[in-house]
Amino acid sequence: FLEGGSSASQRSEAPVEPTTETVPEQSEQSEPPEQPEPEQEPEQPAAPERSLHQQNMLDLLETLAVKGRAPKTGYSRDEFGQRWKDIDRNGCDQRNDILARDLTNVEAPKGCKVLSGDLQDPYTGQHIHFVRGQKTSQAVQIDHVVALADAWQKGAQQLSPERREQFANDPMNLLAVDGPANMQKGAGDAATWLPANKGFRCTYVSIQVRVKAEYQLWVTQAEKEAIQRELGRC
């Protein structure tokens, strides 16, 4: 022990002031940055609505068998019976009936035989003045829209002679048209020949579909695709 002193344990220590740390005030939480909106894909244009005619013809086309072209063996015009037979029994042959139906300003003084008239040709879009005569009659010809030879190679061989004759004279399959255009067409189907007049092509292939359905004739794959393309443009 030291005199006049106290032990270290007896010394009182100065109280220690508690320290407080200043906590910085939290600033208001900032809003999260706006996320960029995902880019929207451009809307695809809606497919054009099909007309009732288009849909009906496309549906009818689907009922036709698709096969290859059969050999032309045995074909002749005579296999389709009497030419221009008066099948509706109105007293006029079928050629004159179609001329009277398709021409305007028709002159037929004796009732049946069309002597002249005007044709707005569906195949070329041109106007043709028809005058009957040895050198002029062929300017306007009557076309089988489904050609006889084409029909022969796509099912008509199996038809009865009477049914083939009906086919060859059916007004649904006959059109008054420009002679040279008809000669150019020959026995072509929709895959190999279409009218130069694009405005008539929809009607043209529609007639072919109806006729082939009526007489249970088939189409080739290329022919079917050509018809589908034209119906899609109707």
Model-derived segments and spans:
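N-terminal low-complexity, Pro/Thr-rich disordered segments
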Residues: L2-L64, C234
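Exposed alpha-helical structural elements
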Residues: H53-L60, Q94-I98, T203, I207, ...
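Short helix-coil boundary/hinge micro-motifs
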Residues: A65-A70
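Short coil/turn segments at secondary-structure boundaries
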Residues: Y75, K113-L115, T220-E225
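N-terminal post-signal-peptidase region of extra-cytosolic proteins
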Residues: F80-K85, Q94-S116, L159-R163
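Acidic, glycine-anchored loop motifs typical of Ca2+
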Residues: R89-G91
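A glycine-rich, hydrophobic loop/mini-helix early in the fold
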Residues: N105-K135
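Domain-level detector of nuclease and nuclease-like folds
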Residues: Y123, H127-C234
